[in-house]
Amino acid sequence: METDCNPVDLSSMSGFEEGSELNGFEGTDMKDMQLEAEAVVNDVLFAVNNMFVSKSLPCADDVAYINVETKERNRYCLELTEAGLRVVGYAFDQVEDHLQTPYHETVYSLLDTLSPAYREAFGNALLQRLEALKRDGQS
């Protein structure tokens, strides 16, 4: 029998380990999305001026808000949900309900569209890591 999709090994994904209590949504608590937001911040903080999880806007089990200032000094409020990340405001802690911005699967994709300086910083960091690996491989 042939299928049109590729099977996914869920054991490599966080929270889907065999026997894990987090399989499905039972047992998850309201801090899960906030923890995810904190991980997003830690991942790309090196490539922006400022980025932090909002303390003013409410976090829930299905949504968290992240404030980011790009190297170009543009400020955004981002919404993080199961659908991904999207811009919901153009100032810290600001949600503009009328905005219909697209969702991005990753913070990298979103910042890549917002900030050429992010793209450059990310590329430079990647190049430095590759050069370090090359040096380590030659020793």
Swiss-Prot record:
Q: What's the superkingdom here? A: Eukaryota
Q: Where exactly is the site Required for GSK3B interaction?
A: 130
Report a single Gene Ontology molecular function: protein kinase A binding
Q: Where in the cell is it found?
A: Cytoplasm; Nucleus
> InterPro entries under this entry?
GSKIP, GSKIP_dom, GSKIP_dom_sf
Keyword check for Cytoplasm: yes
* Principal location: cytoplasm
Keyword field contains Cytoplasm: yes
Q: Which GO terms describe its biological process?
A: intrinsic apoptotic signaling pathway in response to oxidative stress; negative regulation of protein kinase activity; positive regulation of canonical Wnt signaling pathway; regulation of Wnt signaling pathway
Q: Where are the transmembrane segments?
A: none
Q: Which GO terms describe its cellular component?
A: cytoplasm; nucleus
UniProt PTM comment: Phosphorylated by GSK3B.
Pfam families noted in UniProt: GSKIP_dom (PF05303)
* Location of region: Interaction with GSK3B and acts as a GSK3B inhibitor: 115-139
Give the span(s) annotated as Required for PRKAR2A interaction. Answer: 41-45
* Family named by the database record: Belongs to the GSKIP family.
Q: What is this protein called?
A: GSK3B-interacting protein
By which gene is this protein encoded? Gskip
